[in-house]
Amino acid sequence: MPSAPTWPALITTLIEGRHLSVSESTWAMRQVMRGEATPAQLGGLLVALRASGETVDEIVGFRDAVLEDALPLDADPRALDIVGTGGDPYGAVLNISSAASIVAASTGVPVIKHGNRGASSASGASDVLTALGIDLTIAPERVAAVLRETGITYAHAALFHPGFRHAAATRRELGISTLFNVLGPLCNPARPEASAVGVADLSRVPLMVGVFRTRGATALVYRGDDGIDKLTTTGHSHIWEVSRGAVTEHDLDPLELGIPRAPIEALLGEGVEENAEVIRRVLAGEPGPQRDVVLLNAAAGLEAFDLMGDPTRVQQPMARRLREKVTVAAEAVDSGRAAAKLEEWAAATRA
């Protein structure tokens, strides 16, 4: 009978170049979520994993423990999450996923966004949504009600995963991308069946794809060639399409969609309030590179949702599918529905 895991044994396993099993990973994350791991133990785990490179089994084990500990979110899982890992080399990319989520919801697709405050970036989803008037302090049951009333809601990680607070200081002090950047997009407590997920670190794409594939989930996983966890407009992006256990890879040039190239500087923000103001302007219909990148990423979410209902869509060229979805997203913005959706959502969280 194998002996019970210990922190020295697990960290030694990693620094010797070996990997943790699913059960060992689950044990370690349970310790973290319960506050039973010391900052030194957690820091050692995060750094050792970062150095050795996480495996799908390790991420599955960590994810299982996080969801086991999560507060329930009673919502129809036939919904969409648009999210990114963060951890890009710039540290100041606009909150594109948050804006894209609002646009997607304004087209009629139910959106359950999951996120947290910034740890490895200047402005996390929770930060910018607060600045946009979304009340993150509502009770978990109210979060589900807001989805039913408005078609969009936000699962604030600090609310639904209270155990994450035990890792916050260590993550902040390390200041690097860690396994938590990978876990975030995988731990939505509502378990939505469609996901559009940006991954900044190319080495971690197989992890994200592998977990979605193992779950039998539907997802578009993507990364800009400029290193951002978004479909970019500065150049090409790579997309990994996961459907029914199969993975199809695509290369995307925004020019194929009629979207002009933009300098990376146009996609960077200066802070929470500034990012919120950019989102307001985009939702109000202001043209420019910020609008273009939001529409592109909203299109990815819309395509992931449609793929969930019709897996045969994988047979069509990705550029054609996304071009159609960009048109849908643009119409939602230009009609005023996207801006109205933000106001409706904010009001519902304050009701």
From Swiss-Prot:
Coiled coil: none annotated. Pfam families: Glycos_trans_3N (PF02885), Glycos_transf_3 (PF00591). The keyword Amino-acid biosynthesis applies. Its EC number is 2.4.2.18. Mg(2+) 1 binds at residues 97, 230. InterPro entries: Anthranilate_Pribosyl_Tfrase (IPR005940), Glycosyl_Trfase_fam3 (IPR000312), Glycosyl_Trfase_fam3_N_dom (IPR017459), Glycosyl_Trfase_fam3_N_dom_sf (IPR036320), Nuc_phospho_transferase (IPR035902). Binds 2 magnesium ions per monomer. Its cofactor is Mg(2+). GO terms for biological process: L-tryptophan biosynthetic process. Keywords: Amino-acid biosynthesis, Aromatic amino acid biosynthesis, Glycosyltransferase, Magnesium, Metal-binding, Transferase, Tryptophan biosynthesis. Mg(2+) 2 binds at residues 229-230. It catalyses: N-(5-phospho-beta-D-ribosyl)anthranilate + diphosphate = 5-phospho-alpha-D-ribose 1-diphosphate + anthranilate. Anthranilate 1 binds at residues 84, 116. 5-phospho-alpha-D-ribose 1-diphosphate binds at residues 84, 87-88, 95-98, 113-121, 125. Pathway: Amino-acid biosynthesis; L-tryptophan biosynthesis; L-tryptophan from chorismate: step 2/5. GO terms for molecular function: anthranilate phosphoribosyltransferase activity; magnesium ion binding. Anthranilate 2 binds at residue 171. GO terms for cellular component: cytosol. Belongs to the anthranilate phosphoribosyltransferase family. Homodimer. Catalyzes the transfer of the phosphoribosyl group of 5-phosphorylribose-1-pyrophosphate (PRPP) to anthranilate to yield N-(5'-phosphoribosyl)-anthranilate (PRA). This is Anthranilate phosphoribosyltransferase. It comes from Clavibacter sepedonicus (Clavibacter michiganensis subsp. sepedonicus). The gene is trpD.
